Curated annotation (Swiss-Prot):
Protein name as it appears in the record: Phosphoribosylformylglycinamidine synthase
Membrane-spanning residues: none
Residues the record lists as binding ATP: 305-316, 384-386, 676, 886
Pfam family, one: AIRS_C
Species of origin: Pseudomonas syringae pv. syringae (strain B728a)
EC number of this enzyme: 6.3.5.3
Top EC category: ligase
Keyword tags: ATP-binding, Cytoplasm, Glutamine amidotransferase, Ligase, Magnesium, Metal-binding, Nucleotide-binding, Purine biosynthesis
Region Disordered, annotated ranges: 303-327
Membership in a protein family: In the N-terminal section; belongs to the FGAMS family.
Residue ranges occupied by any Glutamine amidotransferase type-1 domain in the UniProt entry: 1045-1298
Function text: Phosphoribosylformylglycinamidine synthase involved in the purines biosynthetic pathway. Catalyzes the ATP-dependent conversion of formylglycinamide ribonucleotide (FGAR) and glutamine to yield formylglycinamidine ribonucleotide (FGAM) and glutamate.
CDD domains: GATase1_FGAR_AT (cd01740), PurL_repeat1 (cd02203), PurL_repeat2 (cd02204)
PROSITE patterns: GATASE_TYPE_1
Length: 1298
């Protein structure tokens, strides 16, 4: 084994933060130093040349001064017997670089901690430095040799029920954490007595996972009686009623991994499977929709919990039908009170929590990062979501109890697209190969399905921790590329059947696959790819290692499937074959036995149906009179409540422009304020139709009136999605996610009554279907605190997500108040019809109260009329701005509109209030409704339309936006409230800022927060030195000659399709080229005029961002020759964007004229930054930027490592004067800047892109390929038609070729 020291592992900011954490744990800690340690398992001595290559490979990341370590060593390594995702990718890179003597590379972090501490304190330090699920801590570098030793497989064990009877199975139930019910234990004893043998542990685990509440939804399928009265339908039956009443537009419901609804027809853009040339195929592009929860893992380990939650939901979409493509994501969090240190709010009363789960604040720091990191690396934009906190002591008939979300809600959802012919699963023929696609088995996430079905606190902490999975998004990306290549083959798609691997691992996925295909299966356990050879059969079969799919591929299609996997470098294995008889057999060639041999009907068959006999409880509540409150104090409290406050800290960490199909993200207007009501994507690059999604949830209302909380969640979803242009209300389909503390007094009846209100009443009345959903029935946390039994129980929680096809994505409304449209009015549409019910409102919560009467949807006809009128007014161009009324009420809706429009407000409440005592309730009630901005000359017509629809009593003019910074509210001329927009916006932004400050580089957070005080910030602007609507490539396109451009990608790259679309539009033939094509000699770069290296996360950024990709080109002789030859050709051009920019900057030794280029390293904020930034095009030789010098315009940014690092100040100066700086970040006034967030990565002198001395090679961190259409821009000037300003860049390249 070779030991190679690496670079320091912590930036200055991360170092001081970790040192502070360690000092809090162990006060004797006085110093800390951390560096990477690399270990190489070699089968022979390396030559000096090979050693040099290895040394260069392992030099990556930013240049940080190296120290001589002192202090006690805590060496954090991957657990022995495992292979980390880092290791598998780094080892791949080494092999691609010709280092065949290296069998494996592995990496650890050597922490050197100074101070005098005891062994107990040393253990506390070790606990803080590692994740015991996947890592261990050593005190000696040499001990790392055990990384490369192989453990012996553990054998099978049987449970002796023939001899030991029921007691033996009850013992196994506890030890293995199976969560079997009494009747299931009886069922298993009967079944195995019938088979005449003892069950193996693997069979029991498999049964427990397949029949867990998590997988079987027993409560939703149960029979019920309430208060002694038998109920006619099950919960699931009532949800399905919505489909039975209105099934039009639904292509698949309740039977697959996601549901499918009818989409628009467009030119679906992808590479031809034979020629690899990108092109558009005109066809229906149907919409798939799915929303999942990952609550249990997120409570225990928020980053991996939320990451694998997102990953699992993405796999559900990809595994729909015969293979589909995920498109856009959403995320949601509900937690208990945050109690931010130094920012604890008056309503946040400390109650404590069990040891086994983390705090609400930790969940909101780590969880969103996990979810965002997975989506970012996979390459899916995160476009909408919600965030709520709730934790309150309430009085019930049984005494006081705390209701809240110690077991959080972590919601991961999204939509995708699927071809019409692939919506339904195919046939599994006898003899079909049963394949696992994706990563290897590892001992992680064991028993997750059963664990998440228990109330937190009823299983052991070790079992809880073992049930959390770990993520590897780059592997999932590779799997998705395989699935994409398969569905792109159309009727030659080799996939006949596909499922994702989730709860229960292969033990759930393979039986489900063959059972759904009406087959049995025969499997060989040792064919499962396995990175932990010491696992027992149960562990191999049931672990929940992520990023895996199971597929059935016909024998005749297998070679085609295999070739696709090899090109994409995606691991797969044939584990079994389909049989005619419905028997499940798993053989084990290592031990020569059969760990599983049972009829599928025993596993999945007649397990007893649950019956629930429950009683209703009287409703609870307390008195709350808002009229006695000080309005200024109320405003301040409400604006700081997390459900109301800015969600910026959740949004800028997630890529919102990847795919180039995003038409509406959360950030609105020239000042990019996070207030959008819905998310909208384009169907494809050639149309203006699309898809919308929006969310609704009002969970605290369930404590007062559970059915009202369900109806309000649906109502809010509709008032949110109404901002997009949708043909008719029934086009909207809903996902319903139900969370409940089943068994808690009154909760089961509340659940039943709410499902009935939604499924049997409101949805049928609206003509809306719920074709998909998910339930989580164990929303309670119990623990003992110094002998006192404590518990926190969540309210019944229905989270609704709406999806719909969109008629015209250019007509999506936003809350941005327009000050350039003359005199305008603000009109309130109050669907509560003046009732102003305050129950469970944010205002009540910020005073520790609930109130008594919840807002509700009293009449479905009002909601239908509202939707129709808004759609009509939008279609006719009458609405300038739109925002729904929700958390915080009318006051918050109008303030958010003013924040987005950077203007003041003059509100007068004369038309909506009768007396002063009503004013607080009018400003803060959360009844359904919306505020719209219309031109004053159109106000009579707009009011008349509402009147004609029966909503005359719901509408009133409440004021006007004004062109200054003042917010004033009056009643009959008397002032009610006044404030400055800037200061109110700071209050609204402060909760987000406080979390950002704890999580990211505090200096950056401070700069962004202070920028809100700037008075004359003009926002994003456009100043062009060319005509955006002038197509300079048109004459060349007319000739019919289309030069070829190689759209280059490596494993983990995810931005190739939109890049190809931009070049295709400019008149090129874009060809899909994988690095594996170049390494294998399948592709010759001499066939291409241009090459573009695309964005993403090549090798998951292992060995540095873009560095692994570059080094596999530098140190592979065939690839090096190919690239060098291409760069030296005077008729060739090259573009590198984001990850491609990082990659090309590391290839500078092959690129003539690139000697001034920097190295790109971690952003100054230490965070992934997804924003719209202003850049100025510099005077340079770049062939892409000719005629654009001096132009200033917005561009999409999405990167974690974009900081341009030069060797020293002289090198920076040389670059500056060499004329090779192509782009610089500027502030909204047009000045070159290093200030955050205008300069999102902190690059010196605002450097955002470089070119070569002759201009043929250009690299940049921003993403022009994501904003080449006008509609792709989060904000754009109104005079832009089809093209965005950045389209000019691609047309310049086409003109240059001629």
């Amino acid at each position: 084994m070779l030991i190679l020291r690496g670079a320091p592992a912590l930036s200055a900011f991360r170092h001081s933060k970790l040192l502070e954490q360690l000092k809090q744990k162990v006060s004797a800690v006085s110093g800390l130093y951390a560096e990477f340690a690399h270990f190489a398992d070699v089968n022979d001595v390396l030559t000096s040349e090979e050693q040099q290559v290895l040394d260069r490979l392992l030099k990556y990341g930013p240049s940080v001064p190296v120290q001589e370590p002192s202090g006690r060593l805590f060496l954090v390594l991957p657990r022995f017997g495992t292979i980390s995702p880092w290791s598998s990718k780094a080892s791949d890179i080494a092999r691609n670089c010709g280092l065949s003597k290296i069998q494996r590379l592995e990496r650890g972090i050597a922490f050197y901690v100074e101070g005098q501490f005891s062994e107990t304190e040393a253990q506390a330090i070790a606990d803080s430095l590692h994740d015991r699920m996947t890592q261990l801590v050593l005190g000696d570098l040499e001990q790392a040799a055990n990384l490369f030793s192989h453990a012996q497989p553990k054998p099978l064990t049987a449970v002796d029920i023939l001899g030991g009877g029921r007691a033996a199975l009850e013992k196994a139930n506890v030890e293995l954490g199976l969560a079997l019910a009494e009747d299931e234990i009886d069922y298993l004893i009967t079944s195995f007595n019938g088979l005449g043998r003892n069950p193996h542990d693997i069979e029991l685990m498999m049964f427990a996972q397949a029949n867990s509440e998590h997988c079987r939804h027993k409560i939703f399928n149960a029979s019920w009686d309430i208060d002694g009265q038998s109920q006619e339908k099950s919960l699931f039956g009532m949800i399905k009623n919505t489909y039975q009443m209105h099934s039009e537009g639904v292509l698949s419901a309740y039977k697959d991994n996601a549901s499918v609804i009818v989409g628009n027809v467009a030119g679906r853009f992808f590479p031809d499977p034979e020629t690899r040339q990108y092109g558009a195929v005109q066809e229906p592009v149907h919409i798939l929709m799915k929303v999942e929860t990952h609550n249990h893992p997120t409570a225990i380990a928020p980053f991996p919990g939320a990451a694998t939650g997102s990953g699992g939901e993405i796999r559900d979409e990809g595994a729909t039908g015969r293979g589909a493509k995920p498109k856009a994501g959403l995320t949601g969090f509900t937690v208990s009170n945050l109690q931010i240190p130094g920012f604890v709010q008056p309503w946040e009363v400390p109650y404590g929590k069990p040891e086994r789960i983390v705090t609400a604040l930790d969940i909101m720091i780590e969880g969103p990062l996990g979810g965002a990191a997975f989506n970012n690396e996979f390459g899916r934009p995160a476009l909408t979501g919600y965030f709520r906190t709730f934790e309150q002591s309430i009085t019930t008939p049984h005494g006081d109890e705390v209701r809240g979300y110690h077991k959080p809600i972590m919601l991961a959802g999204g939509m995708g697209n699927i071809r019409e012919d692939h919506v339904q699963k195919g046939e599994i023929t006898v003899g079909s190969k049963l394949i696992v696609l994706g990563g290897p088995a590892m001992l992680i996430g064991l028993g997750g399905g059963a664990a998440s079905s228990m109330a937190t606190g009823t299983s052991s902490a070790d079992l809880d921790f073992a049930s959390v999975q770990r993520e590897n998004p780059e592997m999932e990306r590779r799997c998705q590329e395989v699935i994409d290549r398969c569905w792109q083959l159309g009727d030659r798609n080799p996939i006949s059947f596909i499922h994702d691997v989730g709860a229960g691992g292969l033990s759930n996925a393979f039986p489900e696959l063959v059972n759904d295909g009406d087959r049995g299966g025969r499997f060989e356990l040792r064919n499962v790819p396995n990175d932990e050879p010491g696992m027992a059969p149960l562990e191999i079969w049931s672990n929940e290692s992520q990023e895996r799919y199971v597929l059935a591929v016909g024998v005749e299609d297998f070679e085609r499937f295999k070739a696709i996997c090899e090109r994409e470098r995606c691991p797969f294995a044939v584990v079994g074959e389909a049989t005619a008889e419905p028997q499940l057999t798993v053989t084990d060639s290592h031990f020569g036995n059969s760990p599983v041999d049972m009829p599928l009907e025993v596993l999945l068959g007649k397990a007893p149906r649950m019956h629930r006999s429950v009683a209703r409880e009287e409703e609870i509540g307390d008195d709350f009179d808002p009229s006695t409150l000080d309005i200024e104090e109320s405003v301040q409290r409400v604006l700081r409540h997390p459900a109301v406050a800015s969600k910026s800290f959740l949004i800028t960490i997630g890529d919102r422009s990847i795919t180039g199909l995003v038409a509406r993200d959360q950030m609105v207007g020239p000042w990019q304020v996070p207030v959008a009501d819905c998310a909208v994507t384009a169907t494809s690059f050639d149309v203006n139709t699309g898809e919308a999604m929006a969310m609704g949830e009002r969970t605290p209302l369930a404590l007062l009136d559970a059915p009202a909380s369900g109806r309000m969640a649906i109502g809010e979803t509709l008032t949110n999605i109404a901002a997009s242009l949708i043909e008719k209300l029934s086009d909207i389909k809903l996902s319903a996610n139900w969370m409940s503390a089943a068994g808690h007094p009154g909760e089961d009846a509340r659940l039943y009554d709410t499902v009935k209100a939604v499924g049997m009443e409101l949805c049928p009345e609206l003509g809306i279907t719920i074709p998909v959903g998910k339930d989580s029935m164990s929303m309670k946390t119990r623990w003992s605190d110094e002998g006192t039994e404590k518990s926190v129980t969540s309210p019944l929680s229905l989270i609704v997500t709406g999806f719909a096809p969109v008629v015209d994505i250019r007509q999506t409304l936003t809350p941005e108040l327009r000050m350039d449209k003359g005199i305008t009015d603000l009109i309130l549409i109050d669907l509560g019809r003046g009732q102003n019910r305050m129950g469970a409102s944010i205002l009540a919560q910020t005073h520790g109260k609930l109130g008594r009467v919840a807002p509700d949807v009293d009449d479905a006809e009002d909601l239908k009329a509202f939707f129709a009128v808004i759609q009509g007014l939008n279609s006719d161009g009458h609405i300038l701005s739109y925002h729904d009324r929700s958390d915080g009420g009318l006051l918050v809706s109008t303030l958010e509109m003013a924040f987005a429009g950077h203007c003041g407000l003059n509100l007068h409440l004369d038309g909506v209030a009768d007396n002063v005592s009503e004013l607080s309730a009018i400003l803060f009630n959360e009844e359904l409704g919306a505020v719209i901005q219309v031109r004053q000359d159109a106000t009579p017509l707009v009011l008349a339309q509402f009147s004609a629809a029966g909503l005359e009593d719901c509408v009133a003019v409440i004021g006007q936006p004004i062109n200054n910074d003042e917010v004033s509210i009056s009643f009959h001329g008397e002032p009610v409230f006044s404030g400055q927009r800037r200061l109110l916006q700071r209050q609204w932004a402060e909760t987000s800022y406080q979390i950002q400050r704890l999580r990211d580089n505090a200096e950056c957070a401070d700069q962004e927060f202070d920028a809100l005080l700037e008075e004359d910030n003009p926002g994003l602007t456009v100043k062009l030195g060319f005509d955006v609507n002038d197509d300079i490539a048109a004459p060349y396109i007319k000739t019919g000659v289309r030069p070829q451009v190689a759209v280059l990608r490596e494993q983990g790259v995810n931005g190739q399709v939109e890049m190809a679309a931009a070049f295709d539009r400019a008149g090129f033939n874009a060809i899909d080229v994988h690095m594996s094509d170049i390494l294998a000699g399948r592709v010759d770069l001499n066939d291409f005029k241009g090459m573009v290296a695309c964005g993403g996360f090549s090798y998951g950024d292992v060995l540095g961002a873009g560095e692994g990709w570059a080094k596999s080109a530098l140190f592979n002789s065939r690839a090096r020759d190919a690239f060098q030859g291409f760069f030296e050709r005077s008729d060739s051009f090259t573009l590198g964007v984001c990850n491609g920019c990082q990659m090309l900057s590391n290839l500078h030794e092959l690129i003539p004229g690139s000697e001034f280029w920097p190295h790109f390293v971690r952003n100054r904020s230490e965070q992934f930054e997804a924003r719209v930034a202003m850049v100025q095009v510099q005077e340079s030789a770049s062939i892409f930027l000719q005629g654009m010098a001096g132009s200033r315009m917005p561009i999409a940014i999405a990167h974690g490592e974009g900081h341009a690092e030069f060797r020293n100040d002289d090198a920076l100066l040389e670059a500056d004067v060499s004329g090779t700086v192509a782009l610089r970040f500027v502030d909204n006034h047009g000045k070159v800047t290093e200030t955050y967030p205008a300069n999102p990565n902190g690059s010196p002198r605002g450097i955002g892109g470089m070119t070569t001395l002759d201009g043929r090679v250009t690299i940049m961190m921003p993403h022009p390929e994501r904003v080449f259409r006008a509609v792709q821009n989060s904000w754009r000037p109104e005079d832009w038609n089809e093209d965005g300003a950045w389209m000019r860049m691609f047309r310049n390249a086409r003109a240059w070729v001629n």
